[in-house]
UniProtKB/Swiss-Prot annotation:
One of its GO terms (molecular function) is ectoine synthase activity. It is an enzyme of class 4 (lyase). It comes from the Bacteria. Its EC number is 4.2.1.108. This is L-ectoine synthase.
């Protein structure tokens, strides 16, 4: 059994802030935990514009705080987000998140991330194998 708190993760190598400071992700469960997924708490700043594309991962996102917009850049669709909203990027869609207020999201990635991935110039995380 693994038990962790976001308090103990804060300011460790599991606590990642984007280069532009727009978002912060606390990686609670990672690939090294060997459970087949990773689980993150991500906070995105109000008024920011954030473009992502997870070409190598499926991501499920559940919004627990805040409001804003999700723009599906592949299908030219826009969605309003509020607490209780969930979106699943099962088609590896390029997307943009535009918070009206600070958003706090709980995110699951499959395959799991290792924790040190950095978005490339296209917003993509590389697929990193977890060492045996």
């Amino acid at each position: 059994m693994i038990v962790r708190t976001t308090t103990e993760i804060t300011d460790t190598d599991r606590d990642i802030t984007s280069e532009d400071g727009n978002w912060r992700s606390k990686r609670i469960v990672l690939g090294g935990d060997r459970v087949g997924f990773s689980f993150h708490e991500t906070t995105i700043k109000a008024g920011s514009v954030n473009e992502f594309h997870y070409a190598n991962h499926v991501e499920a996102v559940w919004l627990v705080e805040g409001t804003g917009k999700l723009i599906d850049l592949d299908n030219n669709k826009e969605y309003d987000l509020a607490p209780g909203s969930m979106y699943l990027l099962n088609g590896h869609e390029r997307h943009r998140v535009e918070p009206d207020t600070q958003m706090r999201m709980l995110c699951v990635f499959n395959p799991p991330v290792t924790g040190r991935e950095v978005h490339d110039e296209n917003g993509v995380y590389p697929l990193v194998e977890v060492p045996a």
